[in-house]
Swiss-Prot record:
It comes from the Bacteria. It comes from Methylococcus capsulatus (strain ATCC 33009 / NCIMB 11132 / Bath). GO terms for molecular function: chorismate synthase activity; FMN binding. Its cofactor is FMNH2. Keywords: Amino-acid biosynthesis, Aromatic amino acid biosynthesis, FAD, Flavoprotein, FMN, Lyase, NADP. Pfam families: Chorismate_synt. Reduced FMN (FMNH(2)). FMN binds at R125, S126, S127, N238, A239, G278, K293, P294, T295, S296, S297, R319. This is Chorismate synthase. Pathway: Metabolic intermediate biosynthesis; chorismate biosynthesis; chorismate from D-erythrose 4-phosphate and phosphoenolpyruvate: step 7/7. The lineage of its organism: Bacteria, Pseudomonadati, Pseudomonadota, Gammaproteobacteria, Methylococcales. CDD domains: Chorismate_synthase (cd07304). Its EC number is 4.2.3.5.
């Protein structure tokens, strides 16, 4: 099985399954000298971990990360960093009834067709449980970018089902289980999720993620454009079915005179492009948005087939998130951090001696 590594200079390779003994990853390319401990990575893992509210899966995992290599006396050594999280609360018996059945909307069928065999326990490798290691690896990238470049990466829930959330209060995001930037809307979100749970149904969501303080110049045209690689990384998150950079599909209805990001000596006059032009960062906020589909694991009966091609009915009885978007915010932040870290190292390696005749334009004139 290939396709488990992302990055060129800062690389992340993950391994493990939902109901296996552990999940792990290897982070290679991190520069030496970064102060790093498990505590630095644990904060975001706690933000992502399951079982923290009635609105997410009730699987209880501490998601305690162990650093196995690449750190000595509290500093990164420049060698591969090995990370491990042990699974603690698997309940594989919940999946015995679907051992020979394909859950509609899941990767069961496609994994079976590709490999001729699959780990049916919680989805195996296709489970979002794998994203715990992305968050751990992303924690390294976030720390480096923050301490060396002053880059801050934050995400938030922008929409849950039909409920659109605006405006954004950055100080409120981590004060509720939804990562909702408007505390006044939290009771509405709770009522919506309670009703869904009673129905046995699920909901989709939209998550926005913003990187502030990114220097201009990151991105490698033409195939490794920064926006292309961000879209690639964000689309790799489980359940993501759409990615927008900046105004995204809103550009279809916009006129060029409005959409273009005009400039002045005082700064940019707009950011429709989401901080990226020609595949290269402008120095403005990098803004991305992901759309996550409704969870397919439902208590409601669904039609499907078994491994013999016979018609069957499937009811999922395991512990699942009724909306995967609720816990997706730290995952999206991690994937953006990994891409930005990789592109910073690539840019530094090729262009650190470039003499610029122009100081960067301020991100905003306002």
């Amino acid at each position: 099985m290939s396709g488990n590594t992302i990055g060129k200079l800062f690389t992340v390779t993950t391994f493990g399954e939902s109901h296996g003994p552990a999940l792990g990853c290897i982070v290679d390319g991190c520069p030496p000298g970064l102060a790093l401990s498990e505590a630095d990575l644990q904060h975001d893992l706690y933000r992502r971990r399951p079982g923290q509210s009635r609105h997410t899966t009730q699987r209880r995992e501490s998601d305690t990360v162990k650093i196995l290599s690449g750190v000595f006396e509290g500093l990164t050594t420049g060698t591969p960093i090995g990370l491990l999280i042990e699974n603690e609360d698997q309940r594989s018996k919940d999946y015995a009834s679907i051992a020979d059945r394909f859950r509609p909307g899941h990767a069961d069928y496609t994994y079976h067709m590709k490999y001729g065999f699959r780990d049916y326990r919680g989805g195996g490798r296709s489970s979002a449980r794998e994203t715990a290691m992305r968050v751990a690896a992303g924690g390294i990238a976030k720390k480096y970018l923050r301490e060396r470049l002053g880059v801050e990466i934050r995400g938030y829930l922008a929409q849950l089902g039909p409920i659109r959330i605006d405006p954004v209060d950055w100080n409120a995001i981590d004060d509720n289980p939804f990562f909702c930037p408007d505390p006044a809307r939290v009771p509405e979100l709770e009522a919506y999720m309670d009703a869904l749970r009673k129905e046995g149904d699920s909901s989709g969501a939209r998550v926005n993620v913003v990187a502030r303080g990114v220097p201009p110049g990151l991105g490698e045209p033409v195939f490794d454009r920064l926006d292309a690689e961000l879209a690639y990384a964000l689309m790799s998150i489980n359940a993501v079915k759409g990615v927008e950079i900046g105004a995204g599909f809103g550009c279809v209805e916009a006129k060029g005179s409005v959409f273009r990001d005009e400039m002045s000596p005082e700064g940019f006059l707009g950011n429709s492009a989401g901080g990226i032009l020609g595949g290269i960062s402008t120095g403005q906020d990098i803004v991305a948005s992901i759309a996550l589909k409704p969870t397919s694991s439902l208590r409601l009966p669904g039609r499907s087939v078994n491994i013999r091609g016979e018609s069957v009915e499937v009811v999922t009885t395991g512990r699942h998130d009724p909306c995967v978007g609720i816990r997706a915010t730290p995952i999206a932040e991690a994937m953006m951090a990994i891409v930005l870290m990789d592109h910073y190292l690539r840019h530094r390696g090729q262009n650190q001696d470039v003499v610029r005749t122009l100081d960067p334009i301020p991100p905003s004139a306002f």
